[in-house]
């Protein structure tokens, strides 16, 4: 439940609140982005969905189990991903997308270490810029990873990847993930849930 509702012709950041399931309120920073938001990713909360696939090389392995733990929204919709790779191995969950060369694309997702031994380990996200990886250092709390890249080709795969040769932590890593989003924008925009099609809100 919002404290207030209003409209304006620009963007701003303000403090909002929402009701907690066990009573009371939690407060958070919210951005009142004016305009439609299109999440280009499909199955933004289900990484077993048909538009996501595994990409493996060398000794890489990946396992995805859906709806295993509470999401940042306090619903049982976050997935568990287990990846294992060493050396030149690659273990990734990917989705193929179209893009316009030179345009910015912003990607975001929520991550959390699944086990105590995974806290502090690093996984990677590769977005629209080929060869550019963003580090995600896992915590025992939900953290949102945000990044913006310019597209280097007319198509790319968004990779949630374990690739030690590019800086992820060698060996097995298990983490929770929820709320992946890609927008054709120069900044990360408010989250929009998707299923089997891109959604605009």
Question: Which ranges hold each PLM region?
Answer:
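Glycine- and acidic residue-enriched flexible segments with recurrent GG/GxG motifs
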Residues: 1-201
């Amino acid at each position: 439940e919002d404290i207030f509702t209003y409209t304006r012709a620009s963007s701003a950041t303000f403090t909002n609140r929402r009701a907690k399931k066990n009573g009371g309120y939690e407060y958070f920073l919210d951005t009142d982005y004016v305009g439609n938001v299109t999440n280009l990713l499909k199955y933004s909360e289900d990484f077993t969905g048909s538009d996501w696939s595994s990409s493996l090389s060398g000794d890489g392995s990946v396992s995805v189990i859906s709806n295993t733990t509470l999401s940042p929204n306090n619903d049982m919709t976050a997935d568990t991903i287990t990846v294992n790779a060493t050396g030149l191995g690659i273990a990734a969950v990917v989705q193929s997308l179209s893009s316009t060369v030179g345009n910015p694309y912003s990607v975001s997702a929520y991550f959390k270490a699944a086990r105590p031994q995974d806290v502090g380990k690093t996984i990677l996200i590769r977005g629209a810029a080929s060869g550019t990886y963003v580090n995600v250092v896992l915590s025992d709390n939900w953290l949102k990873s945000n990044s913006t890249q310019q597209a280097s080709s007319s198509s790319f795969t968004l990779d949630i990847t374990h690739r030690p040769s590019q800086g992820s932590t060698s060996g097995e890593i298990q983490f929770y993930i929820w709320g992946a989003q890609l927008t054709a924008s120069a900044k990360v925009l408010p989250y929009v849930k998707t299923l089997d099609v891109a959604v605009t809100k």
